[in-house]
């Protein structure tokens, strides 16, 4: 879900890739 994906990205503060890797 984009919402969670965006939330993770903001929490990490690293970027889209970081969030994506974390999610996957």
Curated annotation (Swiss-Prot):
Gene Ontology CC terms: cell surface; cortical granule; cytolytic granule; cytosol; extracellular region; sarcoplasmic reticulum lumen
Does Repeat count among this protein's keywords? no
- Asked if the keyword Calcium belongs to this entry, the reply reads yes
Q: What processes does the entry annotate via GO biological process terms? A: protein stabilization
Give the UniProt tissue specificity note.
Pancreas.
Q: Which cysteines are joined by disulfide bonds?
A: none
Q: Where in the cell is it found?
A: Endoplasmic reticulum lumen; Cytoplasm, Cytosol; Cytolytic granule; Secreted, Extracellular space, Extracellular matrix
One MF term in GO for this entry? carbohydrate binding
Keyword list, A-Z: Calcium, Chaperone, Cytoplasm, Cytoplasmic vesicle, Endoplasmic reticulum, Extracellular matrix, Lectin, Lysosome, Metal-binding, Sarcoplasmic reticulum, Secreted, Zinc
Protein family: Belongs to the calreticulin family.
Q: How does it assemble?
A: Monomer. Component of an EIF2 complex at least composed of CELF1/CUGBP1, CALR, CALR3, EIF2S1, EIF2S2, HSP90B1 and HSPA5. Interacts with PDIA3/ERp57 and SPACA9. Interacts with TRIM21. Interacts with NR3C1. Interacts with PPIB. Interacts (via P-domain) with PDIA5. Interacts with CLCC1.
Role of this protein: Calcium-binding chaperone that promotes folding, oligomeric assembly and quality control in the endoplasmic reticulum (ER) via the calreticulin/calnexin cycle. This lectin interacts transiently with almost all of the monoglucosylated glycoproteins that are synthesized in the ER. Interacts with the DNA-binding domain of NR3C1 and mediates its nuclear export. Involved in maternal gene expression regulation. May participate in oocyte maturation via the regulation of calcium homeostasis.
This protein's name = Calreticulin
Q: Which organism is it from?
A: Canis lupus familiaris (Dog)
